[in-house]
Structure formats: C-alpha cells, structure tokens
Amino acid sequence: EWLDPEKEKKSAYGFGLSFDQKVHDAVTLFARYGWQDPKVYNPDITASGDLNYSLKHSWSAGLQVEGKPWRRENDVLGLAVGQVIPSQDYRRSFDPELACKDEGHLEAYYSMHINDHLSISPDFQYIWNPFGKDISDDTDDIFIYGLRTQVDF
C-alpha cells in the first residue's frame, strides 16, 4: 500500500547511479539506473486529471560520438534507450485486463556547434507503452520532435 501523507510521516527515499566511460577518442558510453521507494505515490491524493506514474526502477544506456571523425570536432551525435518500470502496487491499482507494461523510450540528437556562442540540437524521441498503456488499451506510441538551442554569453 502507498503511504498516506495525512497520516504517515515517513521519509521518501531512492537512489541513482550514473556511469560514463570514454572508450575511444570520440566515443563515450553511458548507463544510468534509478530506484525509488514505490510507496511515495498515492493515486487517491492526486489532482483530478493528473497522469501520475508510480515508478520503482528506471534505466537508460547510450552513446555519444563527438564530431572528430567527420571534421566537426565540436558537434555531438547522441543515441539512448531506456525504460521506466512501474511498481507492483501501481500495476495492481488499475484494471488487470490492461496489464500495465514498462514504458520505453528511444532518443537521438545531433548537437551542431554553430560558433563559440551558439549550438543547435535537433532531437527525436520515441516512447512506447506510454504510461504503461494503463489509461486505455489503445494508447498510441508517442513521437516527439524538438529543437534545442544553447546560447552562451
């Protein structure tokens, strides 16, 4: 069962790990892992219409390639994949026929160094089983296209 913040005065806790390793002059691999006490979420106290998601684990892994091989030393290509894994309490709290699944994501970006003050990064993200497909069984996968801009003064 989830903690009731009106009655329980227990602390929430979790931890995260992050590893980055340069394996070549231009290639860095990374891995991330996080865990939280899944009892910190209580669907009975969330605002109406909020789409909260009680997670227990999350992980991601990927690589980053600097632009040296194609003579753009300050550019960076990044690829990542990961999952968020809901708690068992969360899985049991919804219609069992929906069979809440793990949510996954894939991301790719390319950071273009324009000059010493400006970088532009087109970004693509693909999310499957959004919210574990627990809201309705026909939840579509999500495609996100973005453009990040970094301005340094």
Please name every model-derived segment.
Residues 22-26, 67-78, 114-120:
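Short loop/turn motifs that connect adjacent beta-strands in outer-membrane beta-barrel proteins
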Residues 35-39, 65-67, 81-87, 126-130, ...:
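Transmembrane beta-strands of outer-membrane beta-barrel pores
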Residues 79, 139-153:
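Outer-membrane beta-barrel "beta-signal"
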Residues 15, 29, 33-35, 61, ...:
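Transmembrane beta-barrel strands of outer-membrane/channel proteins
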Residues 20, 64-68, 109-111, 150-152:
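Transmembrane beta-barrel domains of outer membrane proteins
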Residues 1-19:
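Surface-exposed beta-loop-beta
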Residues 13-17, 33, 57-63, 104-108, ...:
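Hydrophobic, lipid-facing positions within transmembrane beta-strands of outer-membrane proteins
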